[in-house]
Amino acid sequence: HPMRYVQPGTLPPDYETGIAAVNEKLAADGVDIKVEIIRIPWGEYDTKLNLMLSSGEPFELLHVMQDVKNMSALAAMGAIVSVDPYLDKYPELVGMFTETEWLGSLYNGEHYAIPCSWRSFDNLMSYMNVRVDVMKAVGYDEFPSGSVDDVIDLMKKSQEYILNETGIKAYNWFHQNQDTAHWLHRTYDSYPFYVENSLGLVLARQDGTIDSFYESEEFKNDCETYYEMYQAGLVNPDVLNIDHSVMYDDAQLGAFLPSQTFDPATGVTIQQKTGINTTVEWVEMNPEKPEMICTFVQNLNAISDTSEDMESGLKFLNWLYASKENHDLFHYGIEGVHYNPVGENRIEYIKDENDNTLYTMDTWMSGYLPFMRFSSDAPDTQIDYMTYKAENAVVSPIAGFIFDASNVQTELSNLQTEIIASIYPIKVGMVSYEDNIDQAIANLKAAGLDTYLNEYRTQFSAYLEANPWVLEMAK
């Protein structure tokens, strides 16, 4: 049976050799499927995927990203099917994931995907990464986690230092423009609370109250801080228009300010590319406050409604996670040809003449943390970051809730457009909150904000009623 697996991105140079070895091993293990990876380039991902789904193109497995096109949206349009009828046959696969990870794959009371457990989500949202050498050079022995004013001062001094060092003006970045300033939220008296990250419309309080984030005091505070930062030149003036790759290109040369993106491995890249002796560490405001667990799972793999055999995808995942050997083969290729293992959990990739890794499959789509290998030059802090388990954490009541937007499709698409037009310029500090928020909220309301939030509250109330443990867990 074919096992066509649709993912975003592009295939590695030596894909054919690697996947042939995977199929050989599957055959030797008596698994009657033939794996083929179908990649859709990021730039065309939304359009191409929608086209595949609407035309009924046959494939077996779909990678689902909750922050791009979430599982409930795919399930609501009938693109993926419930896996519950088949799970009894795969007890080992079921046992690989925690109860909370499985909660993250529920839609209308049924499991619609297999979780991908590639990292801990205990520290997903509110961290910043900072160049420690620069921080110390400009007079801060440690990250000033108790004061936003000091963080801004650190950013200003770091910007000047990095400009002298690299000739590049460094900026504070969001991971994506849609993101919320979660790092600031830890400094507010109303914390813990969580703002849903894909649109930022929903502010969820720990008691289950759903507030309108863009109409909240918290959003006002975020904007006032970012206005100060933008006016001080700490945010790229072209942030809403430039290609996102610019931020990574600059960061790899050492030019970034404390930001809610990047990771400790960035420090290694900077050293390799520039020779600057630096380390990058993850920090947060008010570390004594609890972590916010805001999702049980961020990536999943689902069975396509157009699958030739509904179990091919499950057979593949069951085989993939059955051993570290299978996991190594699929993700890293043939030992000695595509990679060399370094100890139990490190790896050296073999590259082609253009310095491209010959063969690798992204672990964030199909990896399993206990089996994953990290680059031999990745700092220990990177592994700590990926595997971190919080001692002190609260779980957001919306962590396991997946909103089904099918009743508010029109409002949703109008709001998506309007948020970019009216909210982004205020959020990144380009224009002042005071002068622009009333018009922005009026525009959101015209686009259907209240209808959207009412639908969200209705579904969320039903979810709380069906799952009374949620608010207990959120205490």
Where are these regions (language model features)?
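Extracytoplasmic/secretory soluble proteins
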Residues: 1-475
